Amino acid sequence: MIIYATAVQTINSFVRLESLKEVYGLIWIFVPIFSLVLGIITGVLVIVWLEREISAGIQQRIGPEYAGPLGILQALADGTKLLFKENLRPSRGNPPLFSIGPSIAVISILLSYSVIPFSNHLVLADLNIGIFLWIAISSIAPIGLLMSGYGSNNKYSFLGGLRAAAQSISYEIPLTLCVLSISLLSNSLSTVDIVEAQSKYGFWGWNLWRQPIGFIIFLISSLAECERLPFDLPEAEEELIAGYQTEYSGIKFGLFYVASYLNLLISSLFVTVLYLGGWNISIPYISILELFQRDQIFGTTIGIFITLAKTYLFLFISIATRWTLPRLRMDQLLNLGWKFLLPISLGNLLLTTSFQLFSL
């Protein structure tokens, strides 16, 4: 009996140990996801504060200054206010579409962050088709906007949803062609491989110098995808009140607000990854990989800092563009996408393909 009891205790302790391993395994799965979401939320709050400060400087006025030091908690205060506001529903709208639309817009953009390499080996999902996964997922967001516009049963909302879909289709194609040119130069669709392909010559190894036309087209197309001035036709205040957001209030309106800045941040991160060398130091023959091999924590920290510095540089350009340029007309926006950016990006892809073939 003593031997039997000892065997039972051994088995029970083994089962408990295996259960603890499974629990710890699940925890370690969610730790990087939670860290990424926390970092994204912090980044969005910083962007909102930066936009308020930069716009105040451009317009020669005082920005937010009461909510926290230098007004840095103003975005948090706005989010809290929206959280406690009443959620109104249009009486004759389509409740399922009206409720699901904002969630689709936010979730589709959030999933795109999984393929962003913030530093060496610091990426949630290093996929062989990472760059195409971003394009595929980001094309889902306009469907949510169209659902929101249709489900609101409002002519302004519906027109805003249609404009969002038309604008996304018009600028998604030139953006995809620019991404194809980059993947041809790097011989890979992985975001990590694209960054590493730019690491050899430092500043001069960036794809910005090898693809200047593609960079400009990608810049314009990404701003149009973010629906920011001068491309904010889907929510033009003078024409459509607030576009597809007209009937929304409370937390659902806040989701659209967050989705706009999430889209701006992911576009800036992809500009950094595709054209500005990602996490690499802009000094020839000095790579983050060398620092990472010496000290992993120090190398990772430096890589994150460099990635975010390049990202926020592009964000400054995007914010300054919003507050300095006038809005385009709808016909001008579509003509720019279909008659100019699409042929130029296609020609750029053909030139890149030709150079790659001749260099073999």
Curated annotation (Swiss-Prot):
Keywords: Chloroplast, Membrane, NAD, NADP, Plastid, Plastoquinone, Quinone, Thylakoid, Translocase, Transmembrane, Transmembrane helix. It is found in: Plastid, Chloroplast thylakoid membrane. One of its GO terms (molecular function) is NADH dehydrogenase activity. Its main location: plastid. Its EC number is 7.1.1.-. It catalyses: a plastoquinone + NADH + (n+1) H(+)(in) = a plastoquinol + NAD(+) + n H(+)(out); a plastoquinone + NADPH + (n+1) H(+)(in) = a plastoquinol + NADP(+) + n H(+)(out). NDH is composed of at least 16 different subunits, 5 of which are encoded in the nucleus. This is NAD(P)H-quinone oxidoreductase subunit 1, chloroplastic. The lineage of its organism: Eukaryota, Viridiplantae, Streptophyta, Embryophyta, Tracheophyta. The chain crosses the membrane at residues 27-47, 98-118, 129-149, 165-185, 203-223, 248-268, 269-289, 297-317, 340-360. It is a multi-pass membrane protein. It is an enzyme of class 7 (translocase). Belongs to the complex I subunit 1 family. GO terms for cellular component: chloroplast thylakoid membrane. GO terms for biological process: aerobic respiration; photosynthesis, light reaction. InterPro entries: NADH_UbQ_OxRdtase_su1/FPO (IPR001694), NADH_UbQ_OxRdtase_su1_CS (IPR018086).
